A protein has these predicted regions:
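Short glycine-aspartate micro-motif
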Residues: 76-80, 135-139, 203-207, 213-215
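Residue-level signal for well-ordered, solvent-exposed loop/turn and beta-edge residues enriched
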Residues: 96-97, 152, 221
Length: 378
């Protein structure tokens, strides 16, 4: 049983559920009702949360539901370090209202800044706090494995961190509560609160950018797993004969075969050894390709691009089929630029239909939130 719990963890669950009883909080964290009551009492005294309503009694005392006190809570500064090489910054309220947002392309930062991304985040926080003294909390979203209870970034394949103790570092420096979360789990919360899964009990969010990750909502709860590593779909080995090495050290991972980076590398390599493609001139001019170039090749039905992308969709279908077979979701939300292509979506569905069980009934669709998903994932 867990002995200690931070107020920020309680707030996160109250925000996620909208209204939640002390008993539900105790069950969520594996704590006694007395311990939960002690923490919630502090939050009630600070007027950060309020007793919103009384539920129906099942024989004993009726449950009292707690919710966030939007009027009391100060502004939240959110920083989202995504897998698509973009840094999204938002300033808003805990109820999801955003009144300031901007984004920074990671590739436009200097080499030193890219190698010390926490300093970049630190500079942003310092600047925003100096301009807005009403900021009362920080929310940091990052790719990879996150232990939000300890406030630690266990492993981020896309960012170099000088210290994994992200929460401790920023709480000490700014004397503000700091929430830390994995990027795809944050996306799942957004889809659950304002997206296509508001009334869906069981769903999967599958994110494809430079890397691949997923988040699973089971019976309306975001599932994290024993080590807070549930959802590492990118590291499912789907090609045991592969020579492509993944960032995790294994070969044949879904991420190494079908992420944006993997797709670009494959097509670039094929062009360089002499394979024909309409992207050859683009590669020669820019010396690199982007996922937009790949989608242009798909639109023009370039043979090489279609060949590589069809294989990528086949591997993605294999990975999704494993998730479908194990989790039996009602809906799958796809996040990533490649899913904007109807041709690729049709190809993915075709490949899934070939291997998935007929008894599985589910909807699969790209997120309807577009780029706003990254801004709201704070």
């Amino acid at each position: 049983m867990k002995e200690n719990i931070r107020e920020e963890e309680i707030l996160k669950i109250v925000k996620e559920y909208g209204e939640v009883s002390r008993l539900e909080l105790a069950e969520t964290f594996g704590l006694t009702s007395a311990r939960i009551s002690k923490v919630t009492k502090n939050l009630l005294e600070k007027k950060i949360i309020i007793e919103k309503s009384v539920g129906e009694s099942s024989g004993g005392r009726p449950p009292v539901y707690l919710s966030i006190n939007n009027e009391k809570f100060k502004d939240i500064l959110g920083i989202n370090l995504t897998s698509n090489r973009m840094l999204y910054i938002t300033l808003g309220k805990i109820n999801g209202e955003i009144f300031k947002k901007k984004k920074i392309a990671i590739d436009l930062l200097s080499k030193d800044e890219q190698e010390d991304i926490l300093k970049v985040v630190d500079d942003i926080i310092g600047k925003e706090i100096s301009q807005n003294p009403n900021i009362g909390a920080l929310s940091i979203i990052i790719t990879g494995s996150v232990d939000e209870e300890k406030g630690v970034s266990v492993m981020s394949p896309h960012y170099s961190l000088k210290t994994p103790k992200v929460v401790e570092y920023f709480e000490r420096k700014y004397n503000l509560p700091v929430l830390l979360e994995n990027d795809v789990r944050a996306m799942a919360l957004v889809e659950k609160q304002i997206g296509s899964c508001r009334n869906v009990k069981n769903f999967v969010v599958f994110n494809l950018g430079e890397g691949i990750g997923s988040a699973n909502c089971i019976d309306k709860k975001i599932y994290k797993g024993h080590n807070s590593m549930a959802g590492e779909a990118g590291h499912i080995v789907i090609n045991t004969n592969s020579i492509r090495k993944c960032s995790c050290g294994k070969r044949g991972c879904l991420e190494a075969e079908s992420s944006e980076m993997a797709i670009i590398k494959k097509i670039t390599s094929e062009i360089k050894i002499g394979k024909y493609s309409i992207l050859k001139d683009i590669l020669k001019e820019k010396e690199f390709l982007t996922i937009k170039d790949i989608l242009y090749g798909v639109k023009k039905r370039d043979f090489l691009v279609i060949q590589v992308m069809t294989e990528a969709m086949e591997y993605i279908a294999r990975g999704l089929n494993i998730l479908i077979s194990v989790l039996d979701p009602e809906k799958i939300i796809l996040v990533g630029e490649i899913f904007s292509s109807k041709f690729l979506m049709d190809t993915l569905k075709f490949e899934l239909n070939k291997i998935s069980l007929d008894v599985h009934s589910y909807a699969i669709e790209p997120t309807k939130l577009g780029e706003d998903l990254y801004f709201y994932s704070q």
